[in-house]
Curated annotation (Swiss-Prot):
Belongs to the globin family. InterPro entries: Globin, Globin-like_sf, Globin/Proto, Hemoglobin_b, Hemoglobin_oxygen_transport. Pfam families: Globin. Heme b binds at residues 63, 92. This is Hemoglobin subunit beta/beta'. Keywords: Heme, Iron, Metal-binding, Oxygen transport, Transport. Involved in oxygen transport from the lung to the various peripheral tissues. GO terms for cellular component: blood microparticle; haptoglobin-hemoglobin complex; hemoglobin complex. Heterotetramer of two alpha chains and two beta chains. It comes from Chroicocephalus ridibundus. GO terms for molecular function: haptoglobin binding; heme binding; metal ion binding; organic acid binding; oxygen binding; oxygen carrier activity; peroxidase activity. Residues 2-146 form the Globin domain. Red blood cells. It comes from the Eukaryota.
């Protein structure tokens, strides 16, 4: 994947403002609320019975932070995303059996969270760069499935 200097700047510039714990928790909670069938992968997280329960669930919050922290690795390694996510792809495919479509859904949710938190900075050009990034990450995570 080729990244222009402008795309790299738009991605890293916004990423520097992201609160990984808060945005990660919000993104994962939104995924579980908007796409309730994704909850089956998180049965060990306890109470996911309502939006209030999901938003207040410390395991959702912790895993959301973990997910977004790992997304930060993509931002740091824009030119090597495929290898950056090789082990995570294997884990999600072989051990967790996560439907790879969920990676695309989470990417779309992350775009919404970023737009909500950084409306002024989230220009159409910024959105285009981030949309490209979440697609590349989703593809890298789904790689082991092919």
């Amino acid at each position: 994947v080729h990244w222009s200097a402008e795309e790299k700047q738009l991605i890293t510039g916004l990423w520097g403002k992201v609160n990984v714990a808060d945005c990660g928790a919000e993104a994962l909670a939104r995924l579980l609320i908007v796409y309730p069938w994704t909850q089956r992968f998180f049965a060990s997280f306890g109470n996911l019975s309502s939006p209030t329960a999901i938003n207040g669930n410390p395991m959702v919050r912790a895993h959301g932070k973990k997910v977004l922290t790992s997304f930060g690795e993509a931002v740091k390694n824009l030119d090597n995303i495929k290898n950056t996510f090789a082990q995570l792809s294997e884990l999600h495919c072989d051990k967790l059996h996560v439907d790879p479509e969920n990676f695309r859904l989470l990417g779309d949710i992350l775009i919404i969270v970023l737009a909500a938190h950084f409306a002024k900075d989230f220009t159409p050009d910024s959105q285009a760069a981030w949309q490209k990034l979440v697609r590349v990450v989703a593809h890298a995570l789904a790689r082991k499935y092919h």
